[in-house]
């Protein structure tokens, strides 16, 4: 089967690659490699405060250890129902570090949607803010 018959839309894409190669690494391993190359560069900025890759990795590792202490292990699913904030990043990468699965849910989702995705994902626990607990 030719590329044009299996993916006919590609003829409209212009001069872009039709296939991308991805490294066989976890997202945590990729961030760790970036931190090793650029330890003093900002990994992110939140509300005017910059966090270096070194600081970011420290928070990720601390968060991963906290999950392990809670009994979260490789293969477990954990829902993160938080706004875009550093703690959500630390949780996402910390879970990836230990091999757990992050189930991201937008905190402004309707209560029924949150319930559906919690049940569907079989999450072992949920991380959220007190403002969203009532949902």
Residue ranges of model-derived segments:
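A short, compositionally biased
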Residues: 3-5, 35-40
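Conserved AMP-binding/adenylate-forming core of the ANL superfamily
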Residues: 21-23, 32, 40-85, 89-93, ...
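Short, solvent-exposed secondary-structure boundary motifs
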Residues: 22-25, 103-105
